[in-house]
Design a protein with these regions (language model features):
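An alpha-helical, amphipathic repeat domain used for nucleic-acid recognition
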Residues: 1-167
């Protein structure tokens, strides 16, 4: 016997309450569409009520995943590399991978990532009091944990640890 999904008729009052809950949730902080959807389902709203609330919020531009990604990137590009930012947006926030990749490609060039990774590495070296090449592996691992690509890490390591050799 094939399983059929029961489609609830749209209850205008519940749909309005779902929208009100969503607006309050969005008032606290910007959220991705998936986070909003999960919140409404967790509150017990049905699919059509959730869709109504989401569409209405999109209409008023309360939910815009592209703008959310740009804002997230603005606040996190100095803390993480592109890979970690993409991971957080796609896996934790539920944003479409293609959208994330396109915006990251447009906004994070290699030069910026190298500069950012260099600053992070210098800060880490200073905090851990690394004075020679023996600590290079720890610095590389730290940058990798922060989400930088190996290509970027290798360039930064070459620049930083060539300086150590000259001293």
């Amino acid at each position: 016997m094939a399983e059929e999904t029961f489609e609830y008729p749209l209850d205008e009052e519940r749909a309005q309450k779902a929208y009100d809950v969503l607006v309050k949730y969005l008032a606290l902080s910007a959220r991705s569409e998936q986070e909003c959807k999960n919140k409404l389902y967790d509150k017990g709203y049905h699919k059509n009520e959730v869709e109504y609330a989401l569409e209405r919020a999109k209409k008023y531009k309360y939910i815009d995943d592209a703008e959310y990604v740009r804002t997230f990137l603005l606040f996190n590009k100095n803390r993480y590399g592109a890979k970690k930012i993409a991971y957080k947006l796609v896996n934790e926030k539920g944003v479409d991978k293609k959208l994330v990749d396109n915006i990251l490609l447009d906004n994070l060039d290699d030069d910026y990532q190298i500069e950012s990774a260099t600053k992070m590495a210098q800060k880490y070296i200073k905090q851990k009091k690394i004075v020679d090449k023996s600590g290079a592996q720890k610095v590389g691992a730290h940058l990798y944990q922060k989400g930088f690509d190996w290509r970027i890490i290798n360039k930064v390591m070459t620049n930083l640890f060539d300086v150590f050799e000259e001293d």
